[in-house]
Regions:
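Polar, enzyme-active/binding microenvironments
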Residues: 1-323
Length: 323
């Protein structure tokens, strides 16, 4: 997501033990990783090409991200979500407020990412999250006010227009999203003042309005989020901030806990990751190429700077088959 958006939720819940379900859904029944081992940072603000797709190799994350196949229609302020096969990049400025949803094929990522579907309404600064069957794109600004709409994209029918399935409890823009196999969480954002709100979407009852859960410890907007099967990590914010908050999915009515910060204060960034690490990339002031890695197993120290983006960007999104 989104983004974060959560991408790569692929395990069938009724086929897995509770222990395995607590892993992120980018692992199969035998906990063998599913999907290619990369994260993708997509689009972003000028200067430069808004269609750029930059790939981080998790197995070699000190290297500079590699430029891959571009978006058919470049964009900034998009949202991203996906499964183990495809990443979907929705909305944004392309160059005006857009309904476009582009699809990145992880197994053919040097190809142009084509336009596949459309949102029910054009929006910028929205957030994306999903499971193995659907992506959900929520919030944002269609202009002139914030939106509460949550659109659902069916991966099995991804050329159709998305359906409005739910609404956020609080309409807002510049929010982030992340989730596990059961729920999507939309956090922070701007609805006049910055918000601490975290709304939870129940995938099994996705026509219901989202439910407000435990809040962020700090009001945050223009933030990013990623996580694993147990925790969500929310990082960065306008001011800018280096803040990272952690939500425990097993206790999601409690306030998020402050964890180790990013290496540099920033906003308008993106995040993605795998079961072990979260990668927070790009952002502002100006446009930044920094990628910070958060170690989920040791999340109280300051994040570690890893290989940078090949092109500095702000207002970008991110997605991964391993998230």
């Amino acid at each position: 997501e989104a983004a974060r958006h959560l991408a790569g939720n692929s395990a069938a819940a009724n086929a897995l033990s509770e222990e395995i379900q607590n892993e992120t859904l980018s692992t199969g029944v035998d906990k063998v990783p599913v999907g290619t081992g990369y994260g993708y940072f997509v689009g972003g603000n000028d200067p430069g090409d808004r269609s750029i797709v930059q790939r981080v190799d998790y197995a070699n994350d000190t290297a500079t991200a590699a430029e891959k196949g571009p978006l058919q229609n470049g964009g900034a302020s998009t949202a991203a979500a996906g499964n183990t096969s495809y990443g979907y990049v929705a909305g944004g400025n392309r160059p005006s407020t857009s309904t476009i949803i582009s699809r990145i094929d992880y197994n053919s990522d040097t190809s142009v990412a084509p336009n596949r579907s459309t949102l029910s309404q054009g929006r910028v600064t929205l957030a994306g999250v999903g499971n193995n069957d659907y992506a959900y794109f929520g919030g944002g600004e269609p202009g002139p006010s914030q939106s509460s709409k949550v659109d659902r994209l069916d991966y099995s029918n991804d050329t159709s227009v998305t359906l409005v399935r739910s609404n956020l409890a609080t309409a807002r823009q510049t929010l982030a999203a992340v989730g596990n196999e059961n729920y999507g969480y939309f956090g922070g954002g701007d609805a006049g003042p910055a918000k601490t709100t975290i709304d939870r979407l129940d995938y099994s009852n996705d026509s219901a309005t989202t439910v407000a859960k435990g809040s962020l410890a700090t009001a945050m907007y223009n933030l990013a989020a990623t996580g694993n099967g147990n925790f969500a990590y929310w990082g960065g914010s306008t001011t800018p901030l280096s803040t990272v908050n952690r939500t425990d999915y097993s206790s999601d009515t409690t306030t998020a806990a402050a964890k180790g910060p990013l290496t540099v204060a920033r906003d308008k960034l993106a995040a993605t990751g795998n079961t072990s690490y979260g990668y927070f990339g790009g952002g502002s002031p100006g446009t930044m190429s920094t990628i910070d890695r958060v170690d989920f197993s040791n999340d109280t120290p300051t994040a570690v700077a890893k290989g940078p983006l090949v092109a500095a960007r702000s207002y970008l999104s991110a997605v991964s088959p391993r998230e």
